[in-house]
Amino acid sequence: MIVPAGRPGPAFYLAGDSFPDDVGVERALAPRLGPHFDGWVGQAALADIPGGFDPAIAARAAQLEAALPEGPALRRVVLIGRSSGARVVTEVACRRPVQAVICLGYPFRRPGGPLEPARFAHLSGLAVPTLILQGTSDAYGTPTAARFHPLSPHIQVQALEADHRLRLAAPDWDAACRLILDFCAHAAAPHDLTG
């Protein structure tokens, strides 16, 4: 199936387990990215769905899937997630062919914990164009460590000078959002999802 080019959107943003403590990430992204999409659905809006904010991965995935449009409109959606929100959006994208996925601080491995394939095994089969922005001092996995996991060829990993909390100065957020917008523009170009 050929996906037509066009303006991306809406964008759906999912925070990490620490929501609302990590709301600063969405506050940095929304004003920089929102105007470039046909709508912005943030974590607070998703949490207002009956059931509220449930940190469980399966519950959040079901909540997100219920909020997504059906039919051709789905292929214009961009999913953005931070930390566990990144895990949710990638799992959903394995089932729902959206236009692009953006991950910030993907939680590859709990600090000091054992490998948990449930965190990353699905990434090997992800067919949606995906950008992972990973902090060089992220305790859940650096960009170098990320490349040792089985990643689909549709996934790109870019380094950010940051930790897992993504405490970035305004110019660094500007640069990160330019990367995201460039990636989404490329993903919006016509491409065949059948091959």
Positions of PLM-derived features:
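Catalytic histidine neighborhood in serine/cysteine hydrolases
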Residues: 38-40, 152-166
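Serine-hydrolase catalytic machinery in alpha/beta-hydrolase-like enzymes
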Residues: 1-78, 87-91, 119, 168
